Amino acid sequence: MKLLSGNSNRPLSQAIAEYLDMPLTRAQVRRFADLEVFVTIDENVRGEDVFVIQSTSYPANDNLMELLICIDALKRASGKRITAVIPYFGYARQDRKTGGRTPISAKLVANLITRSGADRVLTMDLHAGQIQGFFDIPTDNLLPSRLMAEDIRRHYPMGDDLMVVSPDVGGVVRARALAKRLDDADLAIVDKRRSGPGQSEVMNIIGDVKDRRCILFDDIADSAGTLCNAAQALMAHGAKSVSAYITHGVLSGAAADRVANSVLTELVVTDSIEASDPAKACPKIRYVSCAPLIGEAIRRIANEESVSKLFD
């Protein structure tokens, strides 16, 4: 087995390698003067089971091209089986047509990864689970609910006043999965209506949050506007405190400042996307590593063991 890392999140790749007690494969992923991507694999991978670790986060197009070219290089070097390990799958929010003459970019990206030579995809908490069906190759979508539940138990006392909250109707299934792992905690839903692109307006809270310690749970925090508005609404409805757990911390623009100035007690995100300097500097943002989860999935795939047992 070989592990290869792109440039999008080398600290996570190194952490996964440490979990598996093996080194990263020597490779050079660099750019020419015109920013074309060039990849050289510096070790023999003929007949090997190779895992390429690369989130397609910002800059999404550059990191996607790196991934595709790495896969192509490995295929031409006679790698036996190539698994694209994509902790954060960019373009996942473009999973359907939202109007006339608009693309389904998530499907296009799935086609590109497949045609580049990948034999399998391993990802985590897709924005929409049905994106798995966009791939014509085996695709495993890891769920972070166990990882998050373990962290919550370490940092928050369990009790009847603990409540899991979905920041929108679309995330109810995700939030319910976390609630079940927290002694079947109560569930609430924030009904929000977007007032424009990149903006959100909280309208209503479904569930009684008065005097409850609320845990918001979602897959992506981009501008963090949804989270901060939801937290404000929960506090206005009598919540005792509000924390947030997010799988993918995109945290673009002024997101870190927005979190710092919000009523959130803290925002906990995985390291599926490498932390930006503003995120590292924000006292309310804390990272929990997904390396053990991804590393264990890689080990199971390489040994032909069940990956679904990780969801039990």
From Swiss-Prot:
Catalytic activity: D-ribose 5-phosphate + ATP = 5-phospho-alpha-D-ribose 1-diphosphate + AMP + H(+)
GO molecular function, one term: ribose phosphate diphosphokinase activity
Compartments, record wording: Cytoplasm
Binding site for ATP: 34-36, 93-94
Binding site for Mg(2+) 1: 127
Pathway the protein takes part in: Metabolic intermediate biosynthesis; 5-phospho-alpha-D-ribose 1-diphosphate biosynthesis; 5-phospho-alpha-D-ribose 1-diphosphate from D-ribose 5-phosphate (route I): step 1/1
Binding site for Mg(2+) 2: 168
Keywords noted in UniProt: ATP-binding, Cytoplasm, Kinase, Magnesium, Metal-binding, Nucleotide biosynthesis, Nucleotide-binding, Transferase
Cofactor: binding comment: Binds 2 Mg(2+) ions per subunit.
Superkingdom of origin organism: Bacteria
GO cellular component: cytoplasm; ribose phosphate diphosphokinase complex
InterPro entries with a match to the protein in the record: PRib_PP_synth_CS (IPR000842), Pribosyltran_N (IPR029099), PRibTrfase_dom (IPR000836), PRTase-like (IPR029057), Rib-P_diPkinase (IPR005946), Rib-P_diPkinase_bac (IPR037515)
Coiled coil segments of this chain: none
Cofactor(s) this protein cannot do without: Mg(2+)
UniProt signal peptide: none
Residues spanning the membrane: none
GO biological process, one term: 5-phosphoribose 1-diphosphate biosynthetic process
Function: Involved in the biosynthesis of the central metabolite phospho-alpha-D-ribosyl-1-pyrophosphate (PRPP) via the transfer of pyrophosphoryl group from ATP to 1-hydroxyl of ribose-5-phosphate (Rib-5-P).
Complex and partners: Homohexamer.
Family: Belongs to the ribose-phosphate pyrophosphokinase family. Class I subfamily.
Protein name, per record: Ribose-phosphate pyrophosphokinase
Encoding gene per record: prs
